[in-house]
Amino acid sequence: MDISSRHFRAEFLQEWQGSPDAPYFDPSTPRNITGLVGHPVRLLCRVKNLQNRTVSWVRHRDIHLLTVGRYTYTSDQRFEAQHKPRSEEWALRIRSPQRRDSGQYECQISTTPPIGHAVFLNI
């Protein structure tokens, strides 16, 4: 690799990754979750460098905001936000999931614009 190729690659990676202290999702987090009807299931995302931003879970089927931070914003009592202080893990727990709960969910970081990590649930 010559110097100009390395320089281009370095510029591209810097632009693609954004600021070195910007929040990002741990790419090793599972994107496909399979659960059983009636058995609790947990959707997970790991966020690095969150700083003062918040994490939310959104159900794509109806663009329903389910959680913000550790607070649950849906009247459906089966959904629960889970997060341990000082942890990088943010989870959405669904008690007694049904087949209709299958589909895409998104863990979002409150950047401008928001960035998301899609998780697909199959019940």
Predicted feature locations:
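Repeat-scaffold signature, strongest for collagen triple-helical Gly-X-Y repeats
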Residues: Y24-P27, L36-V37, N49, S75-D76, ...
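N-terminal V-set
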Residues: M1-Y24, K48-E80, G116
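Generic serine detector
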Residues: S4-S5, S19, S28, S56, ...
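Beta-strand elements of modular eukaryotic interaction domains
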Residues: R31-I33, R46, V68-R70, E80-H83, ...
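N-terminal edge beta-strand
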Residues: L13-V41
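Aromatic sugar-binding surface patches on proteins
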Residues: Q82, R86-A91
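Structural signature of extracellular immunoglobulin-like
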Residues: P40-N49, T54-D62, R93-S96, D101-T112, ...
